[in-house]
Amino acid sequence: MEDPLIGRDSLGGGGTDRVRRSEAITHGTPFQKAAALVDLAEDGIGLPVEILDQSSFGESARYYFIFTRLDLIWSLNYFALLFLNFFEQPLWCEKNPKPSCKDRDYYYLGELPYLTNAESIIYEVITLAILLVHTFFPISYEGSRIFWTSRLNLVKVACVVILFVDVLVDFLYLSPLAFDFLPFRIAPYVRVIIFILSIRELRDTLVLLSGMLGTYLNILALWMLFLLFASWIAFVMFEDTQQGLTVFTSYGATLYQMFILFTTSNNPDVWIPAYKSSRWSSVFFVLYVLIGVYFVTNLILAVVYDSFKEQLAKQVSGMDQMKRRMLEKAFGLIDSDKNGEIDKNQCIKLFEQLTNYRTLPKISKEEFGLIFDELDDTRDFKINKDEFADLCQAIALRFQKEEVPSLFEHFPQIYHSALSQQLRAFVRSPNFGYAISFILIINFIAVVVETTLDIEESSAQKPWQVAEFVFGWIYVLEMALKIYTYGFENYWREGANRFDFLVTWVIVIGETATFITPDENTFFSNGEWIRYLLLARMLRLIRLLMNVQRYRAFIATFITLIPSLMPYLGTIFCVLCIYCSIGVQVFGGLVNAGNKKLFETELAEDDYLLFNFNDYPNGMVTLFNLLVMGNWQVWMESYKDLTGTWWSITYFVSFYVITILLLLNLVVAFVLEAFFTELDLEEEEKCQGQDSQEKRNRRRSAGSKSRSQRVDTLLHHMLGDELSKPECSTSDT
């Protein structure tokens, strides 16, 4: 048996007295500080580059870690700011229309409740106070000079000041002593901007998009030339025909209809008059659609995506540089003689300290020696900075994360008894997973039978409802066994376990409340809402597909793609929020039962009246319909008629150009390339796992990466050519 590099005794009683990274950096030995920095770098957490070289580095790091420990509060406040838009009463309602906004059916409003004026002010003041602390806290670890020279900090401060002024103006507006008219509020827009600036992934995506703006505008100009030229040909060609008399009545009308035809939303309706007059006219429209949709659109996508990858490579390179800077700082702490190299014994001391953290596990001397020799390019039994960075990366990727000792370790007589060890061994075994999968299948059958009987209003559904209640407590038992076996912290690391935990408890509590609550309580006595949660629980059946070889790669790829896509989907959501605020400001209140013009529009004809911009929830749903291009010209033409101006069309055209032609196409292209890249990685790992029997018999398995490591590997593999360019290694992001 291999001798471990670090024995269990050196971990401080099973790791319960772990050294906090912040304490190690501020008060630890050079090796403890270096280990904490390496651990931070491997976690993808970067201390601000400016404070790494400060003489007060330890004290600055202490305040930085205090700031990061409050991340949950900061994050909740970001979302609270954003969600306030959904619960604020629309500003047009403050003008006291007749009837009032309380008549939701008259204005086709959403069902979310509105905050009162007093509640809204209190909400804004609380979130603003937290935001002020969050904005100015970095001065404690960056220092005033660095803080006020950062453009990001200056923009944040400007947004906070604007938000403060807006809240003050709103307060004066609501008071009886001030003005009684407020035409505009900037707060809904500033909240979204603060949300973007405060979340690094969204901020990086915004920087990425701004970097490719020039390329996008160039290709957009080419698209405009194509559209203008094709519209001119159509206007001239059909001038004296029925098409020209009814549809292409002017060049502006022709341009408008040809733009919609470019999106195929009005195909073939727009050219039916021409087709009736001459079947040969279809040749023009068919060629236009083929060239526009299948050539010009894809040309735009190809050019934009190429620019996108170039900008993304710069960001990935920047993150690599941040990680390398952290590792260089750690290397400098170990290299006390400033020789530019460290030996194997110094590395061993470093990794002894790394066992205090969760990222890197215990490593045998033999395994560490093999890795060290493999990366020692000069064969002098010493490694330089470059080799040190490779060593840390190899350790992080080759070995699994160390499990955090369970709290039940405090009761060794029970936890380490023979019965307990047998139980924990069973929970860790595949048989336990098979048993839960079998129960899931039976539960799925029960849900199908119960819902079918419920639709048929059969009294036979009662026993099946009881069965679902029993299944709920079986899942509670499963959850308890996993927590007992792995410990809560290890259990909670897995996203699937978090999903199971939340859904299981909500269902069990809801079902219990339904059984014991009197029928007078309509919310709990009505179990319809629980049925949707039961269907959510059935999503766990997707895991069964992981056992099927032909589906395993697809499911694993999908799971990996989710976190890498979130910044781009989040950016689309933020753009929707900004456009929703504009829509409520410009179009709010136009859709109402007393507007005679409304019932002459296509919104009324198609029964789309609920999809309006009268409040924020309805506006977001309407924008989603525009995003997926579902009859989107209906809203554009209807609001043109309701406002009586062509300028309203710019709102919808700009939305199409930004969200659909740019953002949504980028997401589609990214998914396609990332999917095939992930399949290649899966195939490589499969081949590597079959290379030798020695690798299959390793005590710690290769390729067991964390989610962040898989995303990082995916991006580096996907952007390999771009990252290899010289400019990527020197670009300043």
From Swiss-Prot:
Residues 93-120, 180, 240-245, 261-282, 450-465, 520-528, 579-615, 631-651 are vacuolar. The chain crosses the membrane at residues 72-92, 121-141, 159-179, 181-199, 219-239, 283-303, 429-449, 466-486, 499-519, 529-546, 558-578, 652-672. SUPFAM superfamilies: EF-hand (SSF47473), Voltage-gated potassium channels (SSF81324). It comes from the Eukaryota. Residues 686-695 have a biased composition (Basic and acidic residues). Keywords: Acetylation, Calcium, Calcium channel, Calcium transport, Ion channel, Ion transport, Membrane, Repeat, Transmembrane, Transmembrane helix, Transport, Vacuole, Voltage-gated channel. Residues 322-357, 363-398 form the EF-hand domain. Ubiquitously expressed. PROSITE patterns: EF_HAND_2 (PS50222). Belongs to the calcium channel alpha-1 subunit (TC 1.A.1.11) family. Two pore calcium channel subfamily. Functions as a voltage-gated inward-rectifying Ca(2+) channel (VDCC) across the vacuole membrane. Is one of the essential components of the slow vacuolar (SV) channel. Acts as the major ROS-responsive Ca(2+) channel and is the possible target of Al-dependent inhibition. Involved in the regulation of germination and stomatal movement. Homodimer. This is Two pore calcium channel protein 1. It comes from Arabidopsis thaliana (Mouse-ear cress).
